[in-house]
A protein has these predicted regions:
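Phosphate-bearing ligand-interacting subdomains
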Residues: 1-54, 323, 334-345
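Flexible phosphate-sensing "switch/lid" loops adjacent to ATP/NTP-binding sites
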Residues: 15-17, 65-68, 78, 85-229, ...
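Short beta->alpha connector loops at strand-helix junctions that form conserved
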Residues: 25, 52, 211, 360-361
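"Short basic amphipathic alpha-helical interaction patches in structured regions
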Residues: 36-38, 80-83
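Phosphate-binding P-loop
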Residues: 57-62
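Conserved glycine(s) of the Walker
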Residues: 74-75
């Protein structure tokens, strides 16, 4: 196979192997960082390039609706679920295909199909993977993922009328969309122009959703919308809310709680809070306890690398060791209960003594019916 080396070794690798071309191929990175890396490669003697969707996207025999974003944690998954519901209401068979999360044995993960919770265990899914697949399973939607996206597409086409691309990070779609929906975040105004390849998604999109309008300042909503209109004047722009509900919120009213949030949203997404904090506030908890002073093992390293996450607990669970560190940190933190803002049922993967209540969130259109009309215009 192709050897994997740290990015810090790129200059040495170019010089040692006489590399002619370096290709930048990952996502959710500030434009400035991309160009600093480009400068290193150019100085070492290699050309530097990025690949466009025209050269990377696969074409499906079925209609494709793609959901992407400008940053991690904007609300792609809830939007994908909402669109899947609208498509099913049209009597269409919908299959979601999720952007890859390649951990473990990649050959064994070439094509993965998830239709039941047992499939999550069979494929030994990480917490991050479960966060993406569980909500689809709960909604009765089959979801595919893996490594070989040509094989995945051809298998998904056998049981779908419509393919729903559920994007990861702020990456480009792997499949050529008939309708490209991109989400922007008014809680991070300006990021729609600052991150690669999120800006490309905005410029490519047929329809842009300004999400979380219920939590953002009106001036930031207006600024983000104006920014989108300047970059892509032909795109439809829809404003949506992301209301948070807490199941069993009365159980944590007046209590000291730990808030567990979606890991990627806090790490490379750079957020300081998520649905858990919003839900905890709505449930009138007494106090959100900062778990970072009690973090052990890999979680202590996570806080050191991402200090913005201090105050809440990122649900890092890419290995059994990280899950044990998560459990130990929860047990060591002096709190009465846990408010979970992750999309999964933590009780399925964690064993802790503190009770857990879930904060969940869904997409809500400010002008109901517009997304259905956009689907109808493409699919009939």
């Amino acid at each position: 196979g192709v050897p994997i080396v740290p990015e810090t070794a790129v200059v040495e690798l170019i010089e040692r192997e006489g590399i002619d071309l370096a290709v930048f191929a990952y996502s959710d990175v500030p434009h400035s960082r991309v160009m600093h890396l480009a400068s290193q490669c150019l100085a070492a003697g290699a050309d530097f390039t990025m690949l466009s969707g025209r050269h990377t996207m696969l074409t499906s025999s079925k209609p494709v609706v793609a959901v992407t974003a400008v940053r991690t944690g904007v609300g792609k998954s809830q939007t994908t679920r909402y669109l899947a519901k609208l498509l099913r209401e049209k009597g269409l068979r919908v299959v979601a295909v999720r952007h890859p999360m390649p951990y473990g044995d990649l050959a064994a993960q070439a094509v993965q199909r998830f239709a039941a919770y047992a499939d999550l265990d069979r494929y030994e899914c990480t917490i991050e993977e479960r966060e993406e697949y569980e909500p689809h399973i709960d909604a009765g939607c089959v979801v595919y993922a893996g490594v070989d996206y040509e094989r995945i597409l051809r298998q998904a086409e056998t049981e779908a009328d419509v393919i729903l691309w559920d994007g990861g990070n702020n990456d480009l779609p792997f499949y050529r969309p008939d309708l490209h929906v991109c989400l922007v975040d008014p809680l991070r105004p300006g990021d729609e122009r600052r991150y690669h390849p999120g800006e490309a998604n905005v410029r490519m999109a047929d329809l842009v959703i300004v999400n979380k309008c219920d939590a953002a300042r009106p001036e930031d909503i207006d600024a983000v919308e104006a920014s989108v209109r300047e970059m892509n004047p032909l795109a439809q722009i829809h404003r949506c809310d992301s209301p948070v509900t807490v199941e069993g919120g009365a159980a944590v009213e007046g209590k000291d709680v730990i808030v567990v949030e979606d890991g990627p949203t806090l790490t490379h997404g750079s957020m300081t809070f998520g649905a858990g904090v919003v839900g905890a506030s709505a449930a009138r908890v007494s106090r959100i306890v900062d778990p970072s002073p009690y973090a052990v093992g890999s979680l202590a390293a996570t806080y050191a690398k991402y200090p913005n996450a201090c105050g809440v607990l990122p649900a890092m669970g890419y290995s059994s060791e990280q899950i044990r560190d998560l459990e130990a940190t929860i047990e060591a933190t002096p709190a009465d209960a846990i408010v979970s803002g992750t999309p999964i049922d933590l009780t399925r993967v964690l064993t802790v003594s503190k009770p857990i209540v879930r904060a969940s969130y869904e997409l809500r259109e400010r002008e109901p019916g517009r997304l259905r009309a956009a689907l109808d215009a493409v699919l009939g």
